[in-house]
Structures are given as structure tokens and as C-alpha cells.
């Protein structure tokens, strides 16, 4: 007759810490050709800025060379950059949108 041993089930609980996603700044860069009204329109359409916020950001871009439109997780930031750059080209403006790690 064989011996049966007690089988212990040991569950190791591994706690994985959820890290917040890396965030990225979406930047609009100044140029000498894109009309200020178009920049305001971009900020309102793609970044949901009201007229005053859009105007303030546009003036920052105009005076400082670039301005932050928003801070987003990478996937969202990348999508916004692509959308803005496509919209600018479709409207024949050289406006450049880019991203930087926040």
C-alpha cells in the first residue's frame, strides 16, 4: 500500500504595479506662413480649446516659437500630431505639429 502525501497548493500572489503611461507634450511650432486664425482653428478642432485658450496658445507659439497644445499618453499624442499635420497639408499650410516626452 502506498503512502499518499498531503499536497499543498501554494499560490504566490504577484502584485503587479500598474505604472501610469508615459506622457507626451503635443507641440505646435511657429512658421512665417500659417495664418494665426488657422492655428486657432486647429487648437479648437483637435484640442478642444475655447477661443480664449486657443488665442493664448497661438500667441505663445507666435512669440516663443512653439506652444504646448496638450499632454497625452503616447498613442493619443501621436494620433493628434498625425491629424494636425495632415489637416495643415490639406489646407496648404506648413504648420508643424510634433511631440516631446513630458
Curated annotation (Swiss-Prot):
Domain of life the protein comes from: Bacteria
SUPFAM superfamilies, per the entry: ClpS-like
Short name of any one Pfam family annotated for the protein: ClpS
A Gene Ontology BP annotation from the UniProt entry: proteolysis
Matches recorded under Gene3D superfamilies: 3.30.1390.10
InterPro entries tied to this protein: ClpS (IPR022935), ClpS_core (IPR003769), Ribosomal_bL12_C/ClpS-like (IPR014719)
Family in the record: Belongs to the ClpS family.
NCBIfam families assigned: PRK00033.1-3, PRK00033.1-5
Complex formation: Binds to the N-terminal domain of the chaperone ClpA.
Role this protein plays: Involved in the modulation of the specificity of the ClpAP-mediated ATP-dependent protein degradation.
Protein name (database record): ATP-dependent Clp protease adapter protein ClpS
Protein species of origin: Shewanella oneidensis (strain ATCC 700550 / JCM 31522 / CIP 106686 / LMG 19005 / NCIMB 14063 / MR-1)
